[in-house]
Amino acid sequence: MGVSTLAFVGCTGGAGTTRLAVETAATLARGGERVAVVDAAFATQGLATYVEGRIDADATAVALGDAPVDEALYELGLDADGRVALCPAHAPFERLARAKSSESAQTLETAVDELADRFDRVVLDVPPVAANQAVAAVTTAETRALVVPESERGSDALPRQQGRLRDIGAPADAVVATGIDGDGPALSDADHTVPHIGSDAPIPLATDPDTAVAPILASMTEDLLGVDLGLTFEESGLFSR
């Protein structure tokens, strides 16, 4: 069965954590799994950009107890055997501020546990840990992967976030370097490296086995979650780690 809850934790803003969470969920859905993606990055609200149509209830409403988590789930359109439901943050500043309280963080943690009981996997999109809801997200997750952009800024931020996760009793299990273009030096501490994905790239890429990034995402997903999805790719046949 493997791990049921995975948190991608950004080392910096703009590390690509949201896209990585969505692509990981899509990879799992291609393997036939039901996946929920929860946005704990209340300030940036990046997951909301992946939702088509109107967003009413959101992750902050769930955290405040104003809406059940069912009302804050939105389907991601996929060509896959499984499904992905997104729980985005999409709220005015006043509600964002209230949703960052310790009580709201505990409510969000309860909602994540509820989703873990109903879905095969839950993937959490977490900002650099500096607020209550981020702490709740990383402590409730079974596996935590730090996401670091391949840059000097990312390399500098990585030790700080590693230390912060240790301080709250939720150490990182892996490091994922993003934005790799093949021209610069590899991040030596990275367990997985993911190529640069342009902002204009189709969403998601992981469900198309012909894309170069799909097998890379599959390898990372299988390793982080301890599963064998049995995915196939055009060049390599049956995929295995």
List each language-model region with its residue ranges.
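P-loop/Walker-type NTP enzyme "switch/lid" segment
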Residues: 12, 40-116
